[in-house]
Amino acid sequence: MSSQSPSISSEEFAERRRCAAEMAGADGLKGLLICSRGGGTLDRFGDVFYLTNYYTSFPYIPDLAGAWSARAHTFLVLSAKGDCVLVTDAPNDNHTALAEEDVIYTDLVLDGVLEAMRRLGMETGKVGLVGGDVMPVNTYQALDGLLPEVVWPNAQHILVNLRAVKSPDEIALLRRASVVGAQAIEAMMAAAEPGSSHGDVVAAGMAVLAPAGASLYNSFMASGRGGENPQVVRRNFPTWGSKEPLADGQWFRIGLSGVVDGYYFDLSRSKAIGPPTNQQIELFEAAIEIVEAAIAEIRPGVTAETVAQAGLAKQTALGYPNDGVFSGLGHGVGLGWDAPWLAVGDQTVIESGMVLCIERTIRKNGYLGDFEETVVVTEDGCEKITGAQIRYW
């Protein structure tokens, strides 16, 4: 693989903004106000980043009247004519895909939004709101007070639809992220040996991620024993926080996700600590079978629900209840968790160029199996891009 990272061109960012503006106009909107969160979080930065290549690094702090407002949040004001202004609370790092005159840098982010809305003639009428789910209520109330003649219909669907199908350069970035994620999880699985703590395992992964310029998003980690006296060892915060050393006879799983150049990797693996037992292998293999059954259904024209039902049918046939923490079989992936959701009820039609994560965690009698892969949807099926070792038994 080339040492040079793939990237998105300024022309592609401009085309994304053009499409978003056109969709806003088609919905009868004057434009869009797009809000994203930064400040070290990795779960809802994608909408503004998708359109501008900008991420704010400043952490969240409560508003202080006259001094600062809406810190850790970035806003893009985009008119239906295609003009835009980015309002940021951290300096441009020379990667932003906008001209300098189209960026307002200020501690008083809400005042900057007001200035941008007036500059683009959007201080009255219907302006679609994107990212309302990450905007604090007090921020929305303040905006509503500053712009009393604006109506804010939900326009999240515009960015959901744009981000669902990836461009060739996005797919290249997701391939690179998957390579880094695969290398990290293989290092972690190798470190998962008797005597190691969950933290030791994460340290092995970070030794791969940090030099690659990657950020760890989640490392959902658990170990335990099945049988008459089942035991599960895990922590909610951090998700790898257990200090209890791994021991022979335990099962072990990692659900690992992270970000490379803005794009996510997401994968899961399981193994036995010490020699595997038949019961452990049964769960590990069942998780793989369920995921593979869902992957076999992926091709353009089928629905997300159809893919989910294929995996769930295999799970039922194997005798495992659907009682995990996530009832779906997976999701799109890009600058976050994207559409579609591989779940019953999602009628989204699968298209070539989507990138999907397919996942399953199953439990029985105290044993656990966990497996997740990432695929690119092709013209006639899909291609796996995860690349990590699958079986450790």
Where are these regions (language model features)?
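Active-site neighborhoods and metal-handling regions in enzymes and metal-associated proteins
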Residues: 1-393
